[in-house]
From Swiss-Prot:
Location of this chain's protein in the cell: Cell membrane
Chain spans, region Disordered: 1-82
MF terms in GO: ATP binding; ATP hydrolysis activity; metal ion binding; P-type proton-exporting transporter activity
Extracellular side: 135-136, 306-320, 735-754, 844-847
Any GO CC annotation of this UniProt entry: plasma membrane
Name used for this protein in its record: Plasma membrane ATPase
Length: 916
């Protein structure tokens, strides 16, 4: 046991001898999270920072400036140990401006005018022109007012909601760490100027073009946003790094050579606009609905024209019929109401600390069926505490702790949770703490997700060069084994301890070191725990009731992951990600790999590629998948997922790739946002069903009335019906919508089926009203007591159409969900106005009795009940859904063969890459 003896000797050389028993006694209690501890740790880090031996950067060399507006070479010769002074920063900012692209400020006039553009708006504008041609100035004015009203409401609501989101987005602004006045300072990215000495490290989004000036620097930089190249590019001293690139590995200093529009990206406007806030699938849905409704309008007009020509109607009469059908057949408020609903929803989510990067994320989050969640910080507290260490025979725990802390970051900003836990635990290791600051760090290599280790080369007070390593226990053990054989009893005891810690839910970190040119020494294992958040188990149960399946993806060992999953109630089907066999190995057929992923509760020891593959497999099985992440290596899977979620504290790269950025910690924030997104989606869905049914209602009724009886409803009343339909439902964006207990999607066949049937029932109710007024005494028939046909029909149409929204907005019977006061008030106001129209005979002359009005209200309520019963039956009918849409077919043999083929190709491709 030569290595043990050496370790013991080393301990004696650096520490006064302390018995392991005493050391263990002091470390058993968990560490409290108190402010004074954080202050003590910050003071220690500041002391360590002042001795940063690993930031030994050299003066930069002359090189080509990186911008369309060249920066003189003399401005790029900044002292790399002192940086710029405040006066130099001010002068350069005055000359070169802020480090930001010149944004084309959105022209508010053009933005407002955009609400008059679109297929539906064009039809209404054509209707206005037609009304002007008929010299029907009342209809012309009302149609124009309707277009203007929808534009104003949509513009104001979206502007207000956008302002709320923009305010919170400012908190996500990129930061930069620069060397100024001899000190590292964090500034906003736009404040960087040419000649600044910029510090970059893993996870940094580079804010401006620059050239690396650190000797022996090694960075891996993701330039996919610029070049489209998926693999990271290696960078060394003298190489240029471009703005918007992400550092995936390493750390270095660089001198800024170009900022703002003078950067490589700034000279390519198309790249600047690459990250547009798309509106997603719902825009396609609206366009499709608008197109179908236009086709139905045209078909109805053909019927009307044929019947009119057959009766030799005048051209003016035909144009009046055309105008009536056009106005009622196209829902002019549809785009504005849906966009407003989404924008208001985004603002509401922002208040709940969920920043929506693009509106389409709301829709996709509402439909998510599987959430692939990382463990640390989302399911757990991300507050590690250390337990009693396992030391190899002859090793002092103080020695183990000192080595582990030497292999830790010495920067206050960006220090990870593991290093923070070790530094906090130094209060239990006074001797290690007392000598830690006497060591000078020569090299520091941050955590490498491939080797799963972090290492540092330090210089001891005695001048000895020591290499310290901590990381995944088996990876550290492998490092020692590659240097020299480890005695079987030590190897066995070490591995057994790793397994024991894992079964107890501890995450283990192996610690080893090498003195000078000597052999590697294995020192022991430090167990740490990251307990589940207090609300995680409850939230997971709630997620299950919402039809959401959660799969845990973690880099921890299988035992730890399985124990954590068991504690949280996720299940124990947690496997090593290598079993996927997508890394060039494995014999499982492709279809079985897909089944395996589908059935698993989670995967452990995952690499970024595993996360990407899991998301891809689930998507190919037809699931909508959300993925959480926080690191730069999570960016590919965040982009691949239907909804990429950057959790609290995520790196700039992860935030840039995500669809939604959370400022609040934990799974509960995500589930709250999911419920809210389902509410928003439900509002949109309810309004779309409602609005299609209204259009079909009057197309069917007026088409039949004109074709059979050669007459139509008064044009002014038709226009007011269209106005009332839109005004009443503008408040849908603020409705107390219920959220679905299952993931929601645009089931368009079922949506159209329900809308058509509701439209037919509405048309039948209106036809009954019409026909009962055509019989009986000269004062009217069964429904009408006395008065005119047009006002009575107007009231019946207005009431039944307005009340329909109370039916479509509910997830069950219409009485199961109470609407908001805004929606109820808007509907009531419109009903009162429609009633006054009828009583006083506005626009058509002739009054209608109160008795007739009461009869219409009673009859309309009867229609409302029939509609409510029909919608409730259709909504929950699997048979109707199968008839209209059909369920997804079961995976057939052809599908499984394709999956086998795809996985085989992936394995062959990976094996080829390894062999080459």
């Amino acid at each position: 046991m030569a290595h043990s003896a050496a370790s013991g000797a080393a301990s004696a050389a650096h520490f006064e001898k302390k018995t392991p028993e005493v050391a263990h006694e002091e470390k058993k209690p968990p560490l409290p999270e108190e402010e004074d501890e954080d202050e003590d740790m910050d003071a220690l880090i500041e002391e360590l920072e002042s001795q940063d031996g690993h930031i030994d950067i050299e003066d930069d060399e002359d090189g080509e400036p990186g911008g369309a507006r060249p920066v003189p070479d003399e401005l790029l010769t900044t002292d790399t140990r002192h940086g710029l002074t405040d006066a130099e920063v001010v002068a350069r900012r005055k000359k070169y401006g802020l480090n930001q692209m010149k944004e084309e400020k959105e022209n508010l006039v053009l933005k407002f005018l955009s609400y008059f553009v679109g297929p539906i708006q064009f039809v209404m504008e054509a209707a206005a022109i037609l009304a002007a041609g008929l010299e029907d100035w009342v209809d012309f004015g009302v149609i124009c007012a309707l277009l203007l009203l929808n534009a104003c409401v949509g513009f104001v609501q979206e502007f207000q909601a956008g302002s709320i989101v923009d305010e919170l987005k400012k908190t996500l602004a990129l930061k930069a760490v620069v060397l100024r006045n001899g000190r590292l300072t964090e500034v906003e990215a736009p404040e960087v100027v040419p000649g600044d000495i910029l510090q970059v490290e893993e996870g940094t989004i580079i804010p401006a073009d620059g050239r690396i000036v650190t000797e022996e620097a090694f960075l891996q930089v993701d330039q996919s946003a610029i070049t489209g190249e998926s693999l990271a590019v290696d960078k060394h001293k003298g190489d240029t790094c471009y703005a918007s690139s992400a550092v995936k590995r390493g750390e270095a200093f660089m001198v800024i050579t170009a900022t703002g529009d003078n950067t490589f990206v700034g000279r390519g406007p198309a790249l600047v606009n690459a990250a547009s806030a798309g509106t997603g699938h719902f825009t396609e849905v609206l366009n499709g609905i608008g197109t179908v409704l236009l086709i139905l309008v045209i078909l109805t007009l053909l019927v009307v024209w044929v019947s009119s020509f057959y009766r030799s109607n005048s051209i003016v009469t035909i144009l009046e019929f055309t105008l009536a059908i056009t106005i009622i057949g196209v829902p002019v408020g549809l785009p504005a109401v849906v966009t407003t609903t989404m924008a208001v929803g985004a603002a509401y989510l922002a208040k709940k600390k969920a920043i929506v990067q693009k509106l389409s994320a709301i829709e996709s989050l509402a439909g998510v069926e599987i959430l692939c969640s990382d463990k640390t910080g989302t399911l757990t507290k991300n507050k590690l505490s250390l337990a009693e260490p396992y030391c190899v025979s002859g090793v002092d725990p103080e020695d183990l702790m000192l080595t582990a802390c030497l292999a830790a970051s010495r920067k206050k900003k960006g220090i990870d949770a593991i290093d923070k836990a070790f530094l906090k635990s130094l209060r239990y290791y006074p001797r290690a703490k007392s000598v830690l600051t006497q060591y000078k760090v020569l090299e520091f290599h941050p955590f490498d997700p491939v080797s799963k280790k972090v290492s540092a080369v330090v210089l001891s007070p005695q001048g000895e060069r020591i290499t310290c390593v901590k990381g995944a226990p088996l990876s550290v053990l492998k490092t020692v084994e590659e240097d020299h054989p480890i005695p079987d009893e030590v190897d066995s005891a070490y591995k057994n301890k790793v397994a024991e810690f894992a079964t107890r839910g501890f995450r283990s970190l192996g610690v080893a070191r090498k003195r000078g040119e000597g052999s590697w020494e294995i020192l022991g294992i430090m167990p740490c725990s990251d307990p589940p958040r207090h609300d995680t188990a409850k939230t997971i149960n709630e997620a299950k009731t919402l039809g959401l399946s959660i799969k845990m993806l973690t880099g921890d060992a299988v035992g730890i992951a399985r124990e954590t999953s068991r504690q949280l109630g996720l299940g124990t089907n947690v496997y090593n990600a290598e079993r996927l066999g997508l890394g060039g190995g494995g014999t499982m057929p492709g279809s079985e790999v897909y089944d395996f992923v589908e059935a698993a509760d989670g995967f452990a020891e995952v690499f970024p590629q595993h996360k990407y593959n899991v998301v891809e497999i689930l998507q190919q099985r037809g699931y909508l998948v959300a993925m959480t992440g926080d690191g730069v290596n999570d960016a590919p899977s965040l982009k691949k997922a239907d909804t990429g979620i950057a959790v609290e504290g995520a790196s700039d790269a992860a935030r840039s790739a995500a669809d939604i950025v959370f400022l609040a910690p934990g799974l509960s924030a995500i589930i709250d946002a999911l419920k809210t997104s389902r509410q928003i989606f439900h509002r949109m869905y309810a309004y779309v069903v409602y609005r299609i049914a209204l259009s079909l209602h009057l197309e069917i009724f007026l088409g039949l009335w004109i074709a059979i009886l050669n007459t139509s409803l008064n044009l002014q009343l038709v226009v007011f019906i269209a106005i009332f339909a839109d005004i009443a439902t503008l408040a849908i964006a603020y409705d107390n919508a219920p959220f679905s207990k299952t993931p929601v999607k645009w089931n368009l066949p079922k949506l159209w089926g329900m809308s058509v049937l509701l439209g037919i029932v509405l048309a039948v109710g209106t036809w009954i009203t019409l026909t009962t007024m055509l019989v009986g005494s000269e004062n009217g028939g069964i429904v009408q007591n006395f008065g005119r046909t047009h006002p009575v029909l107007f009231l019946e149409i207005s009431l039944t159409e307005n009340w329909l929204i109370f039916i479509t907005r509910a997830n069950g019977p219409f009485w199961s969900s109470i609407p908001s006061w805004q929606l109820s008030g808007a509907i009531l106001l419109v009903d009162i106005i429609a009633t006054l129209f009828t009583i006083f005979g506005w626009f058509v002359g002739g009054q209608t009795s109160i008795v007739a009005v009461v009869r219409i209200w009673v009859f309309s309520f009867g229609c409302f009940c029939v509609l409510g019963g029909l919608y409730y039956l259709l909504q929950g009918s699997a048979g109707f859904d199968n008839m209209m849409h059909g369920k997804s077919p079961k995976k057939n043999q052809k599908q499984r063969s394709l999956e086998d083929f795809v996985v085989s190709l992936q394995r062959v491709s990976t094996q080829h890459e390894k062999s080459s």
